Amino acid sequence: MTNAELFGEGINLMISGMGFVLLFLIVLIYAISFISTLINKYFPEPIPAPVAKPVPSAVPTDNLDHLRPVIAAAIAHHRRQQGLK
């Protein structure tokens, strides 16, 4: 066999192999989609029950009045340490 014949056979083999792989991947995609459809048909995911929203209370929950003296004391302590006042 000459180099040209070997090169031609190599190209032929490469194209045949790539075509076979492409065909196999296409069949695999359709098989996976079909199996997914079957699984979803016979084993559907349960629908979650709606969660009741909590009723907002009349008293605000973010009342931080009890933290104001603590924050003021922390600021005063920091300023004393830094020599600012």
UniProtKB/Swiss-Prot annotation:
It is a single-pass membrane protein. Keywords: Cell membrane, Ion transport, Membrane, Sodium, Sodium transport, Translocase, Transmembrane, Transmembrane helix, Transport. InterPro entries: Na_pump_deCOase, OadG. Its EC number is 7.2.4.2. It comes from the Bacteria. One of its GO terms (biological process) is sodium ion export across plasma membrane. The chain crosses the membrane at residues 15-35. GO terms for molecular function: decarboxylation-driven active transmembrane transporter activity; oxaloacetate decarboxylase activity; sodium ion transmembrane transporter activity. It is found in: Cell membrane. One of its GO terms (cellular component) is plasma membrane. It holds the Pfam family OAD_gamma. NCBIfam families: oadG_fam (TIGR01195), PRK02919.1 (NF002792). Heterotrimer of an alpha, a beta and a gamma subunit. Belongs to the OadG family. Catalyzes the decarboxylation of oxaloacetate coupled to Na(+) translocation. HAMAP family: OadG (MF_00404). This is Probable oxaloacetate decarboxylase gamma chain. It comes from Actinobacillus pleuropneumoniae serotype 5b (strain L20). The gene is oadG.
